[in-house]
Amino acid sequence: LACAGLVMGLAVVPFGASHILMNMWNFGNFWCEFWTSIDVLCVTASIETLCVIAVDRYIAITAPFKYQSLLTKNKARVVILMVWIVSGLTSFLPIQMHWYRATNKEAITCYTNETCCDFFTNQAYAIASSIVSFYVPLVVMVFVYSRVFQVAKRQLQKIDKSEGRFHAQNLSQVEQDGRSGHGLRRSSKFCLKEHKALKTLGIIMGTFTLCWLPFFIVNVVHAIKENLIPKEVYILLNWLGYVNSAFNPLI
């Protein structure tokens, strides 16, 4: 997730800013498509990584004793690799092979113009890439993370009840045995730490969704009904998504 945000900040945002400020593209057709590919790659990798993190937390919460054996470091590396492969197949392959290209006159003119880098896509690519890059991971992420919070909440309630009964029945023993009190405090601190981590991940996922959902809604609408969404709105919402890369380090 950090790598995707870093690449977005170093390789996508500066060229995007130059494109808007100068109102033209100064880096040629090849770099236009390569830059666009990196853009789609980073967005796809970001949300799919968040989706994988949600599944990881779900397994950690629901099957804590099996977690270490189920998710080893090698398996984690394979999953991360798969995320970037899928992201590459969604971005670089169709863009570099020109499968994404629209056939209307305005789009064709832009493709042949060295100073134009507007992202004109055909309907099939716009909808398919939005589904693979955003909507499917979003649905999985929301469903899994809602389950994670439900399970975590129930576990915290059980721990609170257990500690309450323990203190009520064995207060004098706890006072005499420092080790028992230390064990309870350690258990409570661990649960609070896990709960805080879940809240932080929830904020990251929520921020990402709020930043990118408007753009992907507009992206699909634009693919179905051309000229319905003003270009300025499209660019503004795209930059709202870019801003998300600056939020994660702060969160």
Swiss-Prot record:
Topology of the protein relative to the lipid bilayer: Multi-pass membrane protein
Transmembrane regions listed in the UniProt entry: 1-21, 33-55, 77-100, 123-146, 201-224, 232-251
Record localization: Cell membrane; Early endosome; Golgi apparatus
Post-translational modification (record): Phosphorylated by PKA and BARK upon agonist stimulation, which mediates homologous desensitization of the receptor. PKA-mediated phosphorylation seems to facilitate phosphorylation by BARK.
Pfam families (alphabetical): 7tm_1 (PF00001)
MF annotations from Gene Ontology: beta2-adrenergic receptor activity; norepinephrine binding
Residues with PTM Phosphoserine: 172, 187-188
Keyword Membrane: yes
Disulfide bonds: 32-117, 110-116
Classification via SUPFAM superfamilies: Family A G protein-coupled receptor-like
PANTHER family linked: ADRENERGIC RECEPTOR-RELATED G-PROTEIN COUPLED RECEPTOR (PTHR24248), BETA-2 ADRENERGIC RECEPTOR (PTHR24248:SF21)
Function statement: Beta-adrenergic receptors mediate the catecholamine-induced activation of adenylate cyclase through the action of G proteins. The beta-2-adrenergic receptor binds epinephrine with an approximately 30-fold greater affinity than it does norepinephrine.
Protein name: Beta-2 adrenergic receptor
Source organism per UniProt: Meriones unguiculatus (Mongolian jird)
Gene from which the chain derives: ADRB2
